[in-house]
UniProtKB/Swiss-Prot annotation:
HAMAP family attached to this UniProt entry: QueA (MF_00113)
Gene (UniProt): queA
Protein name: S-adenosylmethionine:tRNA ribosyltransferase-isomerase
UniProtKB keywords: Cytoplasm, Queuosine biosynthesis, S-adenosyl-L-methionine, Transferase
Localization terms from the record: Cytoplasm
E.C. designation(s): 2.4.99.17
Amino acid sequence: MKVDLFDFELPERLIAQVPLEQRDASRLMVLDKHTGELTDSSFKHIISFFNEGDCLVLNNTRVLPARLFGTKEDTGAKVELLLLKQETGDKWETLAKPAKRVKKGTVVTFGDGRLKAICTEELEHGGRKMEFQYDGIFYEVLESLGEMPLPPYIKEQLDDKERYQTVYSKEIGSAAAPTAGLHFTEEILQQLKDKGVQIEFITLHVGLGTFRPVSADEVEEHNMHAEFYQMSEETAAALNKVRENGGRIISVGTTSTRTLETIAGEHDGQFKASSGWTSIFIYPGYEFKAIDGMITNFHLPKSSLIMLVSALAGRENILRAYNHAVEEEYRFFSFGDAMLII
């Protein structure tokens, strides 16, 4: 299957550069995956599309302020580090810029010197293994010194770091936000509960690979990045019960979707307490085992994410919906508007 089949024209002005003042002020396009029918709505009205007994599954990961700007201890030369993955304890895999300034043994100092990192290994493509030294609690030091690693298509600075976190974020470890969840407020979640909709959480730590374009010509040749996920025993039991009672399982975002499909795929369509790494790649032809619908944002042309939603709703339906979104000037990507596929 050609990657070009998932291309569409997107004016740059429709790429949202900043979040809206109110999280739930975003627009909502509803796509009937069976008929292809489109409805223009607003996120504040999303409750009306849910039924009592449905279950909403959210990803409670929290984004690390993983961009650190420091100086080499010996020369004072500027260095940027991007935290990619925690190895063990205070050892992290990072991306260094400019990489040539960071050799094995290089010490980088951040802020007022209360955070230091020493390079223990040089990797390819600018990767560096670093061991951190600090006083206090690492994540608190990081919160005060680090910046959010915003996607490459966002050029504006973020005034409030919390706007790149969901209101229910809890488990620290992502390099990017699960952006479909950014629209939710505490009020909307409460209104859904009041209607009899069950709210459940999984964790998937989003990697920077989520922004990596599909460089292959053929969809099947693309290699997905691996991301860590986990589901508790309580959540697994709750989801199995929803399924038994005939309720719908609606995932929030591609990250929740990939987690649920990974787990159901490994347990004959059932949910079980699990943790591990998933590199599941969902594209047209995939048979869904876990979800009945999903809430998502509008994705990049030719990305693995537009392929995932095309698997759920059909490629032609998705491209028609996206063309409608362009005509109606919906906002695209991380800080953009939302789509509900049911």
